[in-house]
Amino acid sequence: MSRRHRAVKREILPDPKFGDVVITRFMNALMYDGKKSTAEGIVYGALEVLRRRGGASADPVVMFHSALDNVKPAVEVRSRRVGGATYQVPVEVRTERRQALAIRWLIDASRKRGENTMQERLSNELLDAVNNRGSAVKKREDTHRMAEANKAFSHYRW
């Protein structure tokens, strides 16, 4: 165990347009080389596309949170060595990590898509996630499937 103090969690300010902390986290994860304004443009553009595609009653922030909830994993597997053998042990995912994984998976899935601009890719991936399809949702399902397959080793939890 480390002898140092645990790092204090930094407070993240809500984004200027919607006043949502999760959207700021998403922007920070999307950002390359400290280019926050570029990341902001991409996220706000994608949310604008969601608003246009969703119809008059569609709130892009609600759709964004819905997409995120559909990608959040409940369980994951972690490697555990027991007597020379390595087991994939299913463990429940903490709330913060759930959110972090969902954000990371959405961004990775968006970057791998074939559309021309990142704005299009992100908006399409978010729409797919809202409708429970797409690469990010598939990643969550694969993670759950892996945990289900290794349920027998759940007594090795720590």
Curated annotation (Swiss-Prot):
Report the SS bond pairs. none
Please cite one Gene Ontology biological process associated with this protein.
translation
Superkingdom in the source lineage: Bacteria
Which terms does the record give in the GO molecular function aspect?
rRNA binding; structural constituent of ribosome; tRNA binding
InterPro entries named in the record: Ribosomal_uS7 (IPR000235), Ribosomal_uS7_bac/org-type (IPR005717), Ribosomal_uS7_CS (IPR020606), Ribosomal_uS7_dom (IPR023798), Ribosomal_uS7_dom_sf (IPR036823)
Spell out the Pfam families in the cross-references: Ribosomal_S7
Q: Which UniProt keywords apply?
A: Ribonucleoprotein, Ribosomal protein, RNA-binding, rRNA-binding, tRNA-binding
Query: Can you cite an annotated GO cellular component?
Result: small ribosomal subunit
Please list every transmembrane segment annotated in the UniProt record, as residue ranges: none
Family to which this protein belongs: Belongs to the universal ribosomal protein uS7 family.
NCBIfam families membership: rpsG_bact
Give the record's subunit note. Answer: Part of the 30S ribosomal subunit. Contacts proteins S9 and S11.
**Role this protein plays:** One of the primary rRNA binding proteins, it binds directly to 16S rRNA where it nucleates assembly of the head domain of the 30S subunit. Is located at the subunit interface close to the decoding center, probably blocks exit of the E-site tRNA.
Q: Write the protein's name.
A: Small ribosomal subunit protein uS7
Q: Which gene encodes it?
A: rpsG
